[in-house]
Each structure stands twice: as C-alpha cells, then as structure tokens.
Amino acid sequence: MNFVSLRVITDDVARLVAFYEQVTTVGARWATPEFAELVTPSCTLAVASTGTVALFGADSARPAANRTAIIEFRVADVDAEHRRLAAAGCVFVQEPTTMPWGNRSLLVRDPDGNLVNLFTPVTAEALQRQAR
C-alpha cells in the first residue's frame, strides 16, 4: 500500500489552490473548477469543493472543521522558505524553530485555517528517519 494523496475540502477552491501554489511553488493541475491537485514527487495534495462531498456520502466532510491534522511539507531549507514567504506577506503561526525530534519547522495556516508545517530535518537522526 502507498500513501499517495491528502484531500482538503473547501468552500473556495481557487483561493486555497492559490495559497498552496505559493507555499509549494508547484502549479496545480485542474481537473474541474471544483477539483485541483498539486503533485509533488512524494505525495499529491488535492483540493476539492464542498460540492464534491456528496459523492462520498452526505455530510462526510466539512471545510475548515479539522483542528487535528497538520499538512506537512519537507523542504530543503526552511529558513530560506521563511524568507520567501515573509517577503510575500505570509503570517506565521510559528517562526522557524528546531523541534526536539530534529526537524526545523515553521507553521502557517492556510486560508481555511488548516495548520501547515514546512520543515527541514537538521539532526543526523531526523535525516535518517526522513531518508527515502
């Protein structure tokens, strides 16, 4: 089994896609106006409208309702990403901080309030854990 995708449901697909395009520097692939994907080498972030929820069962998902998940992106240099996003006017939940488990992380919220972590493994243990 392979983990391949995370889907975020939103009331405003274009706004959320624009945010993730800015954060990841990956252009979205639009299937329909209600569904787009940002494809990276390791996983795909899908963004879908609330109109697609009925396809999975009525009221099976709601936008901006999840405060338990963190959408995470491993980056080559979190401090460089911080400078790039700060220059673009991004508001940070957490400035770059080295965590006890060896990742240097920064946190932002997407326009729907989902927590987004950009991190770089910086210790030998973290680098080994993140080796692919």
Give, region by region, the residue ranges found by the protein language model:
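Conserved active-site tyrosine of GNAT-family acetyltransferases
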Residues: 16-21, 85, 113
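Short, solvent-exposed loop/helix junctions and linker helices
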Residues: 10, 72-75
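Short, conserved charged micro-motifs
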Residues: 15, 78-82
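Vicinal oxygen chelate
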Residues: 1-5, 26-72, 82-109, 121-132
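Short, basic/low-complexity N-terminal boundary segments at the transition from targeting/disordered tails
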Residues: 4-18
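Short glycine-/small-residue motifs
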Residues: 115-118
